């Protein structure tokens, strides 16, 4: 009777361990793919949100410019039209920083989209918590988002506004950067 049980066919310990190992590899592979897909989806969402922040800066610059043009040559103090002549023109540079640089220059600024006021470089930080954005909490702060005003050298009077964003995304060693250029002509 004992002899019959010894020679019965069944799963050996090695076969069971091999099956568990294969199952574990499949599970780890599936989780890795899911994690990678989640990171890609998060980067896509961050890029969309940052693009919205950049578009908001561009629209605020256009609004301030249009206010300035509407009241030219006498901008109204305390109104968006005065921001153009008192803060934007005084922050002009002769050349933009290299794209991909995550350190804003000293003449960088950001437009507070809550009240259309130009905020100085002091509110811009490169310590980004999630994605490049303008925070309108009790105090204004800009995380990885800034504007550079570049005056033209030609007889055409215009200013190119380089709107830049830089932040570190999940799973990447290099920073994500986005930017656009808005050209506005002066009267």
List PLM regions with ranges:
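Low-complexity, Gly/Pro-rich coil/beta segments used as flexible assembly/activation regions
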Residues: 58-187
């Amino acid at each position: 009777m004992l002899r019959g049980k010894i020679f019965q066919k069944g799963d050996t310990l090695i076969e069971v361990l091999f099956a568990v190992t294969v199952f574990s590899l499949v599970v780890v592979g599936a989780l890795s793919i899911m994690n990678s897909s989640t990171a890609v989806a998060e980067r896509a969402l961050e890029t969309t949100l940052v693009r919205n922040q950049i578009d908001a800066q561009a629209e605020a610059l256009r609004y301030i410019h249009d206010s300035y043009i509407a009241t030219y040559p006498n901008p109204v103090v305390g109104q968006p039209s005065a921001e153009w002549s008192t803060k934007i023109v005084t922050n002009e540079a002769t050349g933009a920083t290299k794209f991909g640089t995550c350190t804003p220059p000293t003449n960088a600024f950001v437009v507070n989209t809550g009240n259309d006021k130009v905020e100085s470089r002091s509110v811009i930080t490169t310590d980004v918590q999630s994605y490049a954005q303008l925070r309108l909490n009790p105090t204004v702060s800009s995380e990885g988002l800034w504007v550079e005003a570049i005056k033209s050298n030609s007889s055409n009077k215009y200013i190119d506004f380089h709107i830049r964003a830089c932040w570190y995304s999940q799973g990447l060693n290099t920073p994500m950067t986005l930017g656009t250029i808005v050209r506005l002509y002066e009267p």
